[in-house]
Amino acid sequence: MNHLNVLAKALYDNVAESPDELSFRKGDIMTVLEQDTQGLDGWWLCSLHGRQGIVPGNRLKILVGMYDKKPAGPGPGPPATPAQPQPGLHAPAPPASQYTPMLPNTYQPQPDSVYLVPTPSKAQQGLYQVPGPSPQFQSPPAKQTSTFSKQTPHHPFPSPATDLYQVPPGPGGPAQDIYQVPPSAGMGHDIYQVPPSMDTRSWEGTKPPAKVVVPTRVGQGYVYEAAQPEQDEYDIPRHLLAPGPQDIYDVPPVRGLLPSQYGQEVYDTPPMAVKGPNGRDPLLEVYDVPPSVEKGLPPSNHHAVYDVPPSVSKDVPDGPLLREETYDVPPAFAKAKPFDPARTPLVLAAPPPDSPPAEDVYDVPPPAPDLYDVPPGLRRPGPGTLYDVPRERVLPPEVADGGVVDSGVYAVPPPAEREAPAEGKRLSASSTGSTRSSQSASSLEVAGPGREPLELEVAVEALARLQQGVSATVAHLLDLAGSAGATGSWRSPSEPQEPLVQDLQAAVAAVQSAVHELLEFARSAVGNAAHTSDRALHAKLSRQLQKMEDVHQTLVAHGQALDAGRGGSGATLEDLDRLVACSRAVPEDAKQLASFLHGNASLLFRRTKATAPGPEGGGTLHPNPTDKTSSIQSRPLPSPPKFTSQDSPDGQYENSEGGWMEDYDYVHLQGKEEFEKTQKELLEKGSITRQGKSQLELQQLKQFERLEQEVSRPIDHDLANWTPAQPLAPGRTGGLGPSDRQLLLFYLEQCEANLTTLTNAVDAFFTAVATNQPPKIFVAHSKFVILSAHKLVFIGDTLSRQAKAADVRSQVTHYSNLLCDLLRGIVATTKAAALQYPSPSAAQDMVERVKELGHSTQQFRRVLGQLAAA
């Protein structure tokens, strides 16, 4: 009969392959409840971290000195020969008593069974009380796996029932560097209490929250909403969706249209492109768009205008039909990758006036669609059947022979239309060769004289789509990497899981391609920045672009190392870990680059013209007088934006990383003149206006400017010209005097007006934190919060000095001091959050302080109202 409740140590890592099996790591200590449980030879029933399950016995080692009887089954290792006796030591026990309780004898430690405690002196020796009745702990394990010798503590204990850890005073002798734990008598069962540090090593441990929780404004206060599960889809703006009761794909029909009509259609949904001259197996067509768009049509009809950059189809021969076509579209959009529905949200927009009639559009996808959202493991790989962008449309013969291609609207900023010989023209989106890719990349960095930037709205949408693509592909790669590490398919080359390996390699390529697409967009924007009125914009954007290029090169290097290691004989688990660690930071880098482009979009791209384009517009990208859609891109260049702070120099705080945090401190309670002077200086600093505005989203600019005006408005302190809204009623006997009542009512109105400004500033601050804006953004908003609250402190200071009633002075002074303390806390936490960005804990602490400030200001207003009504 096997003994129960034996403590064992894990010799290797173990990954559970069934719900009944336990996962553990090397070095974990667990309780063996039963050996060879339920007739399963070699499987033991164990308990670890409060969970029970079966584990392979050959991955455990029974610890020393547990029981005084020999187990029924064989031990986990071969029996070792007894050690030779030494002078002054007890002889080892015979094999018949392998499990024996520890006796007060001397224990000779072995090299691998000694716990060293780095205690510098004897003064630091201490005793630690074990909570509750002590279990039978094991002594340090020996190299032998089945022979357990008697052990004797070197230091005597006053009582065998006392559960104390004896901490050795320091290195002195071989027997002093051991944890000696006396046995406990009378225990019916053993309980192993896992230290908290060991709990953190468990794979089931909880992870710290990676997202800052921002309270929601309810009335005049802020409360936290219930936690909502994270959404796995991208929200498409409502104004971009075509009207319809079902909100599904609006795909124009293809049957019954003449070729001339079909060529003028404008799609915002990538249709199914050409299958190729010989067709394809229908089982290989995995699309997320109804496939009947391209069925039954000759290839010549697929030359509509897209809002998504087309790419060269892998099924179409790379012949002269496509060599003469020139687009100003970055070539990275054509790189073939496995299609990920979550990465490419379909954005629909209303068709222009020259699109086909309304009766030719239906809201319901055609029946009998192909496979939708097929899991990656079930997809059949092919050279040209999996796409992340639509295929290239085939040109009609008259266009391929040298005709002018109809102009289109592309969601990528084209730097210029260049006059180049036919052999030097770049393909629309071909990046299959390194020479072609480098040629297109270099051409994007130099803008020619005929530069015509992209429209502002289209560029912003394309930038958001590219950023979302990077985030989605990285998330997909991390999921696959977790699956590969959990199943062990990547570390066990003897039994590889080919579908998972192929999906992992495809996900790595998808991440690299998504980052490359964003880089191509940014390179085009760099070319546009060279022609803007802001001369420093080109240098700033180039620095941001260089950081992203370094990230891309690192990803490519890790991906190549991963592929090379997989093909060779060496283990590649380390390569996979390095790639995953590098990929985790990619979404944040992409977000910073996209945020910078968003903030300067008004300078880099053309503003949308309000009126319909007419023939008197400027030059077009495709100078064809008969082309009806050529006037779409005839837009004048935008005028440079006007900044509200005209006195601040352009280069202020540009060369100093800490400049934007200078002067950001709250000192003592100031007087009125000093406060207004400091407030004016802070508002004129470029650290608030220019450095903050340069990275704000477009929809936040108006809110930022409105807050500037509200915060800069001084406090009205002229009581002579003030008239109360209602006549002052006589107070109760013993109440406030008329002068104090008038003073309270006057400053109560000032307090309510400034509370509105403070509430708006807090809302804008929470929005910046919730959208994970960089420090320069939320620090600028926190200054608005501090300046608005500082006005309330000034009101309280004025009342405490001018009021005659002692009760009024004491209460107002109390809340003024409270607001001062809260402002100091906000300054400290904001600095910490900026220096530790993007730490969620530091940002959450900052949010809590601002939320507490909002509640305290509301209490201050209520106290003023109660005092005025007394």
Swiss-Prot record:
Changing residue 797 to R: Weakens interaction with SH2D3C. Residues 73-85 have a biased composition (Pro residues). Residues 3-65 form the SH3 domain. Residues 97-111, 135-151, 626-655 have a biased composition (Polar residues). GO terms for biological process: actin filament organization; antigen receptor-mediated signaling pathway; B cell receptor signaling pathway; cell adhesion; cell chemotaxis; cell division; cell migration; cell surface receptor protein tyrosine kinase signaling pathway. The modification Phosphothreonine is found at residue 269. A motif (SH3-binding) lies at residues 635-643. This is Breast cancer anti-estrogen resistance protein 1. It comes from Homo sapiens. The lineage of its organism: Eukaryota, Metazoa, Chordata, Craniata, Vertebrata.
